[in-house]
Amino acid sequence: MSRHPVGLLDTSTLLLLPRLGAAADLPERPLISAVTLAELTVGPLVAEDLTERAARLAEVLQAEADFAPLPFDAQAARAFGLVAADLRGSGRKARARTFDAMIAAIAIANDLPLYTCNAADFAGIAGLRVVAIPHPDASPA
């Protein structure tokens, strides 16, 4: 697989980075979105176990230290409308996948490929270039 110089990581891929063995599958310069940072920020607030809360807070702090998130701006908002329409047209509810739809919109608005371990979540979205990353828990084919 050829590497893109820059690419947007979805939230699950960011969280799995320490477990992803093949760095060649990732962009040379990975980026995250403000939506991913927002999604991560929920984690420590809803964790009931103190150890889990601390681990999730560490993930947020690490993401903040490692990345300058791309914003959900007006261009992304316009792209979001198209993403939501595509999801609805394929029988999926954009509301149920709002974070994913917003991340996809940011990728489209910035003309970036989206790197994900959950490629099926982004299938059928026009204008979105998805780079599927093998999930570390998937059994080999």
Regions found by a protein language model. Give the residues of each.
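Short, well-structured N-terminal submotif of metal-dependent ribonuclease cores
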Residues: 1-61, 137-140
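Acidic, PIN/NYN-like endoribonuclease modules and their adjacent C-terminal/linker elements
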Residues: 1-2, 104, 110-141
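Active-site neighborhoods of divalent-metal-dependent phosphate/nucleic-acid chemistry enzymes
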Residues: 2, 42, 67-113
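Acidic active-site catalytic centers that drive phospho-/nucleotidyl reactions
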Residues: 10, 39, 100, 118-121
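Alpha-helix capping/helix-boundary segments
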Residues: 13-14, 76, 120-121
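Residues that scaffold the ATP/ADP-binding catalytic core of kinase and kinase-like folds
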Residues: 16-18, 43, 80-83, 125, ...
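Structural motif
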Residues: 28, 65-68, 126
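Helix N-cap/beta->alpha junction signal
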Residues: 33-34, 73, 100, 118
